[in-house]
Amino acid sequence: SRALNIGMKEVESDAALLLSAHCALYNEVAIEKLIEVQDIFSAAGVFGRQIPTKDSLDIDTRDLLTVFGRERIVYEKHPFFHNAFSLIDTSVWKKIPFSTEVNGIEDRVWAYQVCSDGYKVIYEPSAVAYHEHGLNQGCSNSRAKRVVRALKSLHKNDEVLSFD
């Protein structure tokens, strides 16, 4: 998240495209789709569909195909967001940068914060990128523990969840 904020500080345009080193665009219109949807909804962030590569592990393929569906989703209260292939409104980011207190789900924490401030986050499935390692980067138990700690904190006010 620190590196994301450093990069975002250098952006001089109205929006910043984030594309992970593990991602590759599916086609030449992927970025145009993100921009188009951001303009239509005045969204703080738009993220695209991520699909596995031929070399992705089965566990990553499963996760990508499960999470990144084929229907647009407009999030206003309880968002999901994945910054590996996304477009972020820089004016919103200047008000609400990525938290440096969280590692691994800083994008979801950011989305929750911007939605809490009245902004929208959009999932746009017509914007597509390949993602080699997917959401969880294989089966790293130490990463899973770190992410679960952060998720529990993010969901601490959920009435139906109890982590005691």
Model-derived features: positions:
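Active-site-adjacent helix/loop segment of glycosyltransferases
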Residues: 121, 130-164
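A recurrent flexible, glycine/aromatic-enriched loop bordering the glycosyltransferase active site
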Residues: 52, 70-88, 103
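Short beta-strand-to-loop acidic/aromatic patch adjacent to the donor-nucleotide binding site
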Residues: 14-24
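Glycine-rich, basic loop-to-helix element that forms the pyrophosphate-binding segment
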Residues: 1-11
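Conserved donor NDP-sugar-binding/catalytic core segment of glycosyltransferases
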Residues: 24, 28-59
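Conserved nucleotide-sugar donor-binding
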Residues: 12-13, 82-95
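Short glycine/serine/threonine-enriched helix-capping/active-site loop
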Residues: 46-49, 124-125, 132
